[in-house]
Amino acid sequence: MQDKEKKIKVIVLGGPTGSGKSDLAVKLAEEIGGEIVNADSMQVYRRLDIGTAKPSAADLARVPHHLIDILDPNEDFTASDFRREATAAIADIERRGKRAIVVGGTGLYIRALLYGLVDSPTGDPELRRQFDDVPGEELLRRLSLVDPETAARLHPNDRVRLIRALEVYTQTGRPVSAFRSEHAFSDVHYQVLKMAIRVERQELYRRIDLRVEKMLEDGLVEEVRLLLAAGYGHELKALRSIGYKEITAYLAGEMTLDEAVTLIKRDTRRYAKRQMTWFGKENDIYWLEYPGSFATILGHVIEFLA
């Protein structure tokens, strides 16, 4: 393991969707000569702009961003892919004398970057396709029979992790939880300042509702319509994410727009709650109130970088 003094210093900014991570990250980057490394699993996809709440064109112009718009919607992107790409981006940023700020709410990606990945078998696309039409509740039920520990941590909407856990068990006869227990998750590959934004729950839910309404005003329905017209099917991981799957169902005549919006708000709130739970279990996190005292936050960052 590298000596602490020789490790690259990396700032990680996490928190639930709608907490203001992107805004804070841009402000910090401008102050410290930073560049942002995206750690949101959906913002890597081109054409998925409104529903993923990508940084605005103005913010992208203010500060360099990495790992945004790097894939087409029909391409797979795993935690392993993220770790490889983010590691390369951070090395490039450091080489140019800048500071990397990793920003996002996909906890699995952040953990993969900092601690590495569980040594489990590589993916099997053919095997995964067998689960494509299985409802989330049924995936969770099946997983609970063979890996109750992992099942207890997952939600029926978390199809990617449910399918991956079933895939690993099918391939090896061992639950993912067994592989996880063999990984200490203690060898941090960077010198890290981990920060996360804490928002009172009702305030967060209020922000989420407003954010969803703004997505509709900004053209989310048309964005999904164009994706479908371009040949990207509802079975794709990207179009099964929150916001896209509900609007796809609306466009297919399976629900009204009001019903779709209600589901988007509900599922986004549930996702934000799971994100808060995940970050709450992480060690050594510096919790922020934002909007709050930017000067205090900046001071903490500068002290870390000194």
Curated annotation (Swiss-Prot):
Nucleotide-binding keyword on record = yes
Can you tell me which residues bind substrate? Answer: T17, G18, S19, G20, K21, S22
Record-annotated site: Interaction with substrate tRNA: T106
Q: Which GO terms describe its molecular function?
A: ATP binding; tRNA dimethylallyltransferase activity
Q: What are the entry keywords?
A: ATP-binding, Magnesium, Nucleotide-binding, Transferase, tRNA processing
Chemical reaction(s) catalysed:
adenosine(37) in tRNA + dimethylallyl diphosphate = N(6)-dimethylallyladenosine(37) in tRNA + diphosphate
Metal-binding as UniProt keyword: no
Matching entries from NCBIfam families are given as: miaA
Would you tell me the protein name for this molecule?
tRNA dimethylallyltransferase 1
This protein's encoding gene: miaA1
